[in-house]
């Protein structure tokens, strides 16, 4: 016991050192600002404001939480400030869905609405022709301007959106997931049986927040799962999701046959008590669907799906996640944990896309959605996977129909199988397309997909690829908060305001680094050319000259 206590103190010391030295998130030419609520005046919604050299500014959705506020001291092991605790204490113990159905707007709903607008309601564009031309095609989505707390309440009540916010995760900053809102991106972290520690996972969490992760899933499968999860939750301002099956399996030393409903139930309660915001539950993998996957090229590629299929065959019984689904609903309702219904039969190769097994499970997901809603539990549906571009639209169409417009949460999809080491690119192509079609949450893919556990650089590259995909979809949908950043960056580029161009980029450091590889001096930041075209062939420079000539003529 003494040795175990000493080790725990040592880990706490290491975490304190890390948080003291490395847990500050900074962005160039940016400051933390706060927007006040109107329905709930005590609400202060943190955002990022970029200051431009011409006097303009841009307000951005910010996932960095208190880590980017120099006035907030983050202490370990206590973790982040408990933002939602005062709201939770003074109201009945109900889910956000239950409140929404009763017509009640919660502080979380107003908070999420303020985040979605990013102060865009204060900015008016006077070029009406340009607005009409670039208004976007939202397909069947309805995106109001501005987004109001009442609109968010109604979307939650109808099951078209979720606000994942476990009552035991008061550190989280409320956010909304649904196709009528900004497309969100999830990052996966977590240890394996071979590598990683508590300190490394907290470092990965904060790194993911730095690069824009809207939600984070802890997919730890090795030792110290509970300790890692507790530390992540206490230090996370974004919703945290898990796959409880992984810890349940760890409790029986990886013996699938020894897994029972009782072990899983206790694991579920334990994780809900800690504060996990959403659970991936593979309740749609039914006995009768397992043979459908046998003719596939790559079989069952979902970890949770393959484990439950094996359990069903070993016991010759139906999936206990399905047979005990109402009991799972009761547990999740008690803590306001949201469902992320797992796609255990998702295709793991282009050859298996849109097959009978995949869509059979999707139909069951839709049935389970309706049960979850009956119990007042929020739900979203997980989707593929590996899908060629020409089959992506069918996935979105079927999900909207089978699942009654519940939020769709997809892993990519990867549009080709030939890109190991570059799967973040191949999948971001599919992610942009399906997000435009209506997918609400994109699970990022890193360059290490299919190859190994991602490191910090992999996390960054995966998130950048997926933030591009999400933003491209927001532009295509015509989200009112999407285009201003593009316009400001384009103006800075045309006016040769190099520092502004860098600072408005998703990755300012890389943009500046690439420019400075050939033109490193400060004088080059004021030059009217870059190394690609040089001073004589720069089209922007020539375009300025053309404008000047036309003005003189007219």
UniProtKB/Swiss-Prot annotation:
Enzyme Commission code: 4.1.99.17
Cofactor: [4Fe-4S] cluster
Pathways involved: Cofactor biosynthesis; thiamine diphosphate biosynthesis
Entry's transmembrane regions: none
MF term (GO), any: zinc ion binding
Record-listed [4Fe-4S] cluster binding positions: 530, 533, 538
Keyword entries, A-Z: 4Fe-4S, Iron, Iron-sulfur, Lyase, Metal-binding, S-adenosyl-L-methionine, Thiamine biosynthesis, Zinc
Broadest EC class assigned to this enzyme: lyase
Sites where the protein binds substrate: 188, 217, 246, 282, 302-304, 343-346, 382, 409
Catalysed reactions, as listed in the record: 5-amino-1-(5-phospho-beta-D-ribosyl)imidazole + S-adenosyl-L-methionine = 4-amino-2-methyl-5-(phosphooxymethyl)pyrimidine + CO + 5'-deoxyadenosine + formate + L-methionine + 3 H(+)
GO cellular component, one term: cytosol
Binding site for Zn(2+): 386, 450
Cofactor note: Binds 1 [4Fe-4S] cluster per subunit. The cluster is coordinated with 3 cysteines and an exchangeable S-adenosyl-L-methionine.
GO term, biological process aspect, one: thiamine biosynthetic process
Family the entry assigns: Belongs to the ThiC family.
Described purpose of this protein according to its UniProt entry: Catalyzes the synthesis of the hydroxymethylpyrimidine phosphate (HMP-P) moiety of thiamine from aminoimidazole ribotide (AIR) in a radical S-adenosyl-L-methionine (SAM)-dependent reaction.
Summary of subunit composition and partner proteins: Homodimer.
Listed name of the protein: Phosphomethylpyrimidine synthase
Organism name: Coxiella burnetii (strain CbuG_Q212) (Coxiella burnetii (strain Q212))
